[in-house]
Swiss-Prot record:
Subcellular location: Cytoplasm
Record key words, sorted: Cytoplasm, Lipopolysaccharide biosynthesis, Nucleotidyltransferase, Transferase
Organism: Brucella abortus (strain 2308)
Protein name per UniProt: 3-deoxy-manno-octulosonate cytidylyltransferase
Main location, first listed in the record: cytoplasm
Annotated catalysed reactions: 3-deoxy-alpha-D-manno-oct-2-ulosonate + CTP = CMP-3-deoxy-beta-D-manno-octulosonate + diphosphate
Protein family (similarity comment): Belongs to the KdsB family.
Keyword Zinc included in the entry's annotation: no
Cited SUPFAM superfamilies: Nucleotide-diphospho-sugar transferases
Superkingdom of the source species: Bacteria
This enzyme's EC code(s): 2.7.7.38
Any single GO BP term: lipopolysaccharide biosynthetic process
Entry function: Activates KDO (a required 8-carbon sugar) for incorporation into bacterial lipopolysaccharide in Gram-negative bacteria.
Classification lineage: Bacteria, Pseudomonadati, Pseudomonadota, Alphaproteobacteria, Hyphomicrobiales
Length: 251
């Protein structure tokens, strides 16, 4: 049954990227990347959209472009920890039911894709929801940077119940492989539990934070979408985002 959920969209952002310094403020067609992400997250209309950052520079830039930001501590080990602090500050009375965590390096993400991340929480029993795309490029099947989802099909193959996430090529045998998109929607209680657990053995081995939830018995459902949004981790990725923007006239 479809639930009516009070939702908060949070975008964690920090300046500490080693591969691409000052990444959130990188210019794409005259606008900082973090602002492109905020524009698209706001267009998804999943409640209030707030950037959670430890950088006063990011805070000021975001505010200058008309978006809301909140300062968080600088010692967080993950974006999940940062958004939990932001949630506690923004909603101390506990009125928010679900939190959508949009990564700050997805400047081309479709607002509809963001909306779809919430669906497994609205119409199913999942604790956490995320996104996946069927892999169609052969090289991606063996690329450890393309995280694969091992899961059981649900809802006519448009959704998976996640059993595992891995950098290896899995599952073995005939059939589709799915690329995990690191955008999450959490029930509030699930986020609270998740950040209190601490890193798990498989999480540390695979370097995949979502395995912490699975090892603790939490349910993650994956909504299957059609395209992978461009994630900006390197200068080459940034160049692609700029090319996309210049060709499209806008992101």
């Amino acid at each position: 049954m479809l639930q009516t959920m009070k939702t908060l969209t949070l975008i964690p952002a920090r300046l500490g990227s080693t591969r691409l310094p000052n990444k959130p403020l990188a210019d794409i067609c005259g606008k900082p990347m973090i602002v492109h992400v905020a524009d698209r997250a706001a267009a998804a209309k999943l409640g209030r959209t707030v950037i959670a950052t430890d950088s006063e520079e990011i805070f000021k830039v975001v505010a200058a472009h008309g978006h809301e930001a909140i300062m968080t501590r600088g010692d967080h080990e993950s974006g999940s920890d940062r958004i939990y602090e932001a949630l506690a500050k923004l909603d101390p009375s506990g009125e928010i039911d679900a939190v959508v965590n949009v990564q700050g390096d997805l400047p081309t993400i479709d607002p509809d894709t963001i909306r779809r991340a919430l669906l497994p929480l609205e119409d199913g029993p999942a604790d956490i929801a995320t996104l996946g795309v069927e892999i169609t490029v052969e090289e991606e099947k063996t690329n450890p940077n393309v995280v694969k989802i091992v899961g059981s099909p649900l809802a006519g193959n448009r959704r998976l119940r996640a059993l595992y996430f891995t950098r290896a090529t899995a599952p073995y045998g005939e059939g589709p492989l799915y690329h995990h998109i690191g955008l999450y929607a959490y029930r509030r209680s699930a986020l609270e539990r998740f950040v209190k657990l601490g890193p798990s053995p498989l999480e540390k081995r695979e370097k995949l934070e979502q395995l912490r939830a699975l090892e603790a018995g939490m349910r993650i459902d994956v909504e299957i979408v059609k395209t992978v949004p461009l994630g900006v981790d390197t200068q080459a990725d940034l160049d692609r985002a700029r090319t996309f923007c210049s060709q499209a006239g806008t992101i």
